[in-house]
Amino acid sequence: MSLSPSRIRLLDSVTVNQISAGEVIENAASVVKELIENSLDAGADEIHIETLGGGRGQIVVRDNGVGMDPEEVPVALQRHATSKIAHFADIFSLASYGFRGEALPSIASISKMEIHTARAGGLGSKTLIEKGEPVCCEPAPRQQGTTIAVHSLFYNVPMRQSFQKSPQMDRLAIRRLLENSVLSSEGIGWTWISECRQELYVAKKQGFIERVALVLGESFVQEAFFIDKQQGDLRVLGFLGSPNQHRSTRQGQRLFINNRAVESSFISKKVAEAYAWMIPAQRYPIFVLKLFLPPMWCDFNVHPQKTEVRLLQEGQISNLLVEAISEALLRRSPSLEETVLKVPTEKIPIENEGISVPSIRPAIVSAPLSCPTFSQQPYLKTEMATIVSRDSASSSLSVVEKVRFLTSLGKVLLVEDSEGVHVVFVQAARKHLFYVSLLSERLESRLACQTFLLPSSVQMTKLEADFLQMRLEALTALGIELSRISPDSFAIESAPPFIQEEELKEWIVALAQEGALHVGESFEQLVENTVQKLVFSRNARAFDYAWLDILWKLGKPEKAFDGEMIRRLVLDDDFM
């Protein structure tokens, strides 16, 4: 069926604004972002946010900024109406957050909105807006400032509504946004009420250090390196995490340029280069950095939500960063040397006639809790059942081919079975065994979960802890029982066998970090992604040789769940 050509026409303003909203307003957090930026641009130093239903039910932002006169409100609802610029050239000397004049009309076109505002000494007015158009305006006294209430977000664009995530995920996105706002804006007081409960409160008198401790935790501040360096018009201020606080992704990095939260691969790369000799490969440092640059050096007009930036004079910026970071790290050089040069001295006894060294975990005992069957796990893909062979001869725990350890060559092991000699790649094997340990019920449910005599604790940010709280049931289905002991920490009550404690803690933190940032990602995908990114030692000394038996009980797989080579049979051709 072919469509007949139609005449070219101008779109009406509501349709134009709804299209624009598709670029600017991704979810409820996008609405909160635009409204609080309007408050900041209006000179507010107290901002109060309330949300219901993750923001889709209601968003209210109240401030004590300059406010508007009644006749300004209809103008503010027009596309490209702004008080920030008059000409295009003004963008390059901009000190405000917004400048396009698109946000307010875009939000109004996909919600029901109410604006209550007054200038100093003014009478005040309240305007009701539906589908982007004012339907009622009446006098309403109030103190100087503006309150914007947004109800029924996406009510008239059901297709957009169907693509939204859960209210819990929306709350996580709003929390991360507000945490960045708290870090970027000193001298501003913040209050966030979510579902009628106070989630965040920051007094405007609280300084930068207090705010970093609130968001990232006091332990981060205590161990981090503080930097504050200025060269002419350039300044860098913030905290660099200690070498012990590295992560598997860049999600622990918070960057602000001229008080705007942005992403910059250039800045991240420069910081990573400074840490290269102090943290393992494929790991990323944590930092909170605020750069203050001349406005004409920064182009924020790259992304609709202004989360990306182009920079001029990268050489000067790089020099400032390198000097500031080097000075900070050198001030703590003794402790760094101790961290970097510490070599494990524990010897692991090996018997060449077989694997007789058990996996010793003195802090853990067997518990009656059994790992759930796979049918109880809606979170994991059924396709992943191919990880464990379904051939009863190879997958049985009672009838399994014997494997004999021969020698260690650092990154690989040489082992022998009835088929011949195999090269086992340590890192890939460790990763695969960690992953399969999460699915230990695949081994005919013979492997009981393990309970810690003294529960180990794991710490993270409040945002990450909130995500983990929502996934406790899914983690229990994997044999991992957690209990929340503070707003930013959990106790690990039990775990699958054959997972080392430190690796488990690292993975839990990585899962929380990844989940808090990618709020729409499925749980099974998060599990797979985070295990892939986890750095397992390439050193055979760190490999528990008793796990070779388990590897062979899994049918001695050649490849890990992600396709990486685990073992290879040594053939005669290898010596020709």
Swiss-Prot record:
<dbReference type="GO" id="GO:0006298">
    <property type="term" value="P:mismatch repair"/>
</dbReference>
<dbReference type="GO" id="GO:0016887">
    <property type="term" value="F:ATP hydrolysis activity"/>
</dbReference>
<dbReference type="InterPro" id="IPR014790">
    <property type="entry name" value="MutL_C"/>
</dbReference>
<keyword id="KW-0227">DNA damage</keyword>
<dbReference type="InterPro" id="IPR014762">
    <property type="entry name" value="DNA_mismatch_repair_CS"/>
</dbReference>
<dbReference type="InterPro" id="IPR002099">
    <property type="entry name" value="MutL/Mlh/PMS"/>
</dbReference>
<dbReference type="GO" id="GO:0140664">
    <property type="term" value="F:ATP-dependent DNA damage sensor activity"/>
</dbReference>
<dbReference type="GO" id="GO:0032300">
    <property type="term" value="C:mismatch repair complex"/>
</dbReference>
<dbReference type="InterPro" id="IPR020568">
    <property type="entry name" value="Ribosomal_Su5_D2-typ_SF"/>
</dbReference>
<dbReference type="InterPro" id="IPR038973">
    <property type="entry name" value="MutL/Mlh/Pms-like"/>
</dbReference>
<dbReference type="Pfam" id="PF08676">
    <property type="entry name" value="MutL_C"/>
</dbReference>
<comment type="similarity">
    <text>Belongs to the DNA mismatch repair MutL/HexB family.</text>
</comment>
<dbReference type="InterPro" id="IPR013507">
    <property type="entry name" value="DNA_mismatch_S5_2-like"/>
</dbReference>
<keyword id="KW-0234">DNA repair</keyword>
<dbReference type="Pfam" id="PF13589">
    <property type="entry name" value="HATPase_c_3"/>
</dbReference>
<dbReference type="InterPro" id="IPR042121">
    <property type="entry name" value="MutL_C_regsub"/>
</dbReference>
<protein>
    <recommendedName>
        <fullName>DNA mismatch repair protein MutL</fullName>
    </recommendedName>
</protein>
<dbReference type="GO" id="GO:0005524">
    <property type="term" value="F:ATP binding"/>
</dbReference>
<dbReference type="InterPro" id="IPR037198">
    <property type="entry name" value="MutL_C_sf"/>
</dbReference>
<dbReference type="InterPro" id="IPR036890">
    <property type="entry name" value="HATPase_C_sf"/>
</dbReference>
<dbReference type="InterPro" id="IPR020667">
    <property type="entry name" value="DNA_mismatch_repair_MutL"/>
</dbReference>
<dbReference type="Pfam" id="PF01119">
    <property type="entry name" value="DNA_mis_repair"/>
</dbReference>
<comment type="function">
    <text>This protein is involved in the repair of mismatches in DNA. It is required for dam-dependent methyl-directed DNA mismatch repair. May act as a 'molecular matchmaker', a protein that promotes the formation of a stable complex between two or more DNA-binding proteins in an ATP-dependent manner without itself being part of a final effector complex.</text>
</comment>
<dbReference type="InterPro" id="IPR014721">
    <property type="entry name" value="Ribsml_uS5_D2-typ_fold_subgr"/>
</dbReference>
<dbReference type="InterPro" id="IPR042120">
    <property type="entry name" value="MutL_C_dimsub"/>
</dbReference>
<dbReference type="GO" id="GO:0030983">
    <property type="term" value="F:mismatched DNA binding"/>
</dbReference>
